[in-house]
Amino acid sequence: MSSYENYHKTSRVYDKTRSAGGVETILQALVAGPLPLQQQVLVDAGCGTGLYTAALIGEVQRIEAVDLNAGMLEMAQSKLTTEFEEGRIRFHQSPIGTLPLPDDSMDAVMTNQVLHHLPDDAAANWPGHTEVFREFARVLKPGGCVIINSCGHEQLEQGFWFYRLIPDALQAVKEKAVDLGTLDALLQESGFDALHREVPLDLVLQGDAYLLADGILDPDWRRGDSIWSLVAADALADV
């Protein structure tokens, strides 16, 4: 559940402007694991409407899709009815800090653009993130990997043309997003090593919806990026 966005409402139009970017990078990380792809069980932690699950379901043995928001899970389930009936995916309504999965049972965990939604406290060294990372470590088999799709502060400042129109919201998102150095430290403290970072080209280039200059005037377009929920009504009128 997002600490600031109403995803039950947003779930109905979320896919209008979103796509599963960086899938090839995720696959490269999975291929580097000890098991062949078709034998791997993958956790999609914060699966949302199932964009990444749908993109990867044909590559792995099974996906455990987890999200706290019922609306998001409903949309994900509607995409993957056949796979659910075949037992290739299981859905769980749960926070990602308490995964309903056994210890040492998963081959990999991925979380895509989720971490900045965690209720957390930077001044206390991000205990919410630490809880989540330790939970990932708990469910992973020895040698398993965690794949995090997230934005650093530099990407937030330079990677989205419309963010400069809403500077207060941008600052609020930066305060919710862990800087990359701290992220590495939190992961290491939670038991992860061999850290690697990559910027997928398709995420840098964005999709067609990103280039719509008048998209900011469309409420459905804005719902594709949770930053807009942090824009005050009077500030939105000035955009």
What residue ranges belong to the model's regions?
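Conserved class I S-adenosyl-L-methionine
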Residues: 1-38, 51, 72-75, 82-84, 145-174
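A short acidic, Gly/Pro-enriched loop at the edge of an enzyme's catalytic core
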Residues: 97-109
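Short alpha-helix
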Residues: 175-190
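C-terminal helical/coil "lid" or tail adjacent to the Rossmann-like core of SAM-dependent
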Residues: 203-239
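A short glycine-rich, Lys/Arg-flanked "PGG" loop and its adjoining helix->strand segment in the class I
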Residues: 127-142
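A short SAM/SAH-binding and catalytic strip from SAM-dependent methyltransferases
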Residues: 108-127
